[in-house]
A protein has these predicted regions:
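Conserved beta-sheet core of the metallophosphoesterase superfamily
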Residues: 176, 203-232, 238-244, 249-345
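Catalytic phosphate/metal-binding cores of nucleic-acid and nucleotide-processing enzymes, i.e., regions
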Residues: 12, 16, 60, 162, ...
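Short linear interaction motifs
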Residues: 53-66
Length: 347
């Protein structure tokens, strides 16, 4: 290559390098200007925030207070239902917990210790001298409630009654040593009925017989009062709050869900009670074996659990199973229900 051509080629290369460097310089200068403007905007924002903070009023602090160490007395309420003492549930059939009259006795003992432990825990905070027991029915297990039931009962209802009233009387007698007063309010369930549905009056029921026998057995225990009458419902006053009690077997389910039926029943019962110049705050039932509560217009709708485990009918046909549970809660004169527990009986 001649010298003249080499000079021309070098000139073209230098020109391309110059153009590339000039482009890069413009590019990086553009990035610099963007970052510079961004930094200026951030600094302006910080200055504006500093200016705004000068006009913000200082935060108002609540005065230091000493928490209350003494509170007004509360009363304890125990929901007691759906024992179905004679029911027989076998683990080999359901794959779940066993249940029979001996298991009922063990779970009753568990309930006894749990009630006392919870009472002592809350007595450190407030006075608890009185215990209310809402017996919501299904204490025994009849033989004519559903088809094939006789094969799932361990003993006849008379033997259930004698054994059951002995155990429950001992339970109440033992609790009476720890409370000034125990008030037991009773309604009947459907599993203790005599005959088929609607054949007899509400109180023609083995639950009613057990309740009356408990009155007689415990008549000499001065601080236990058992309230039994022939109605299927009852309203009980606890610390000025009124509790409507019934078993709950006449409440309809929709798609095996009781919530809608309970809401409708509560609304209708409330209208009926007001027509009788009565009123209540809490709607309390058993029967459905699933412990729950939900808010109502004034108080709550509350459903108790069960002593038994899931039986084959409930688990196989209804696809429903619940742990053995009974409800326990405190009631304060000013606020109604305060603390609450689902007492597990299988632990």
């Amino acid at each position: 290559m001649s010298l003249e051509k080499k000079v021309k080629n070098n000139g073209r290369i230098r020109k391309k390098n110059y153009e590339r460097l000039l482009y890069e310089a413009k590019f990086y200068k553009s990035l610099y200007e963007q970052e510079k403007n961004k930094r200026i905007s951030e600094e302006r924002l910080v200055e504006k925030l500093k200016t705004a903070l000068h006009v913000v009023k200082p935060l108002k602090a609540y005065p230091r207070t000493i928490p209350e160490t003494s509170h007004r007395e509360q009363e304890l309420v125990l929901l007691f239902s759906d024992c179905q003492i004679g029911e027989k549930i076998q683990c080999k059939e359901t794959g779940y917990l066993e249940y029979n009259i001996d298991v009922f006795e063990k779970r009753l003992g568990k309930l006894y210790t749990s009630v006392l432990n919870i009472t002592e825990r809350h007595r450190k905070d407030c006075g608890i001298d009185n215990l209310n027991v809402f017996m919501l029915g299904d204490i025994v297990e009849g033989r004519q409630i559903y088809k094939g039931q006789s094969s799932r009962v361990t003993t006849d209802v008379v033997e259930q009654m004698f054994r059951g009233q002995e155990l429950i009387a001992g339970f109440l007698r033992s609790l009476s040593r720890y409370y000034d007063n125990i008030k037991v309010s009773c309604v009947c369930g459907n599993h203790g009925r005599v005959g088929k549905k609607n054949e007899e009056l509400t109180h023609v029921n083995w639950d009613y017989v057990i309740y009356r026998n408990l009155q007689e057995i415990l008549r000499n225990i001065g601080n236990i009062r058992i309230d039994v009458d022939k109605k299927w419902w009852k309203i009980v006053n606890v610390q000025g709050w009124k509790f409507y009690l019934e078993h709950g077997d006449r409440i309809k389910k929709f798609w095996q869900i009781p919530w809608y039926g309970i809401e409708r029943a509560d609304n209708r019962v409330l209208k009926m009670m007001r027509a009788l110049n009565q009123d209540y705050d809490y709607f309390v039932i058993g029967h459905h074996h699933v412990p729950f509560e939900c808010d109502a217009n004034r108080g709550e709708r509350i459903c108790n659990g069960t002593f038994s485990s899931g039986n084959p009918y409930a688990m196989r046909d209804l696809k429903v199973m619940a742990r053995p549970t009974q409800k326990l809660f405190g009631v304060h004169r000013e606020v109604g229900i305060t603390f609450r527990y689902n007492v597990r009986l299988d632990l």
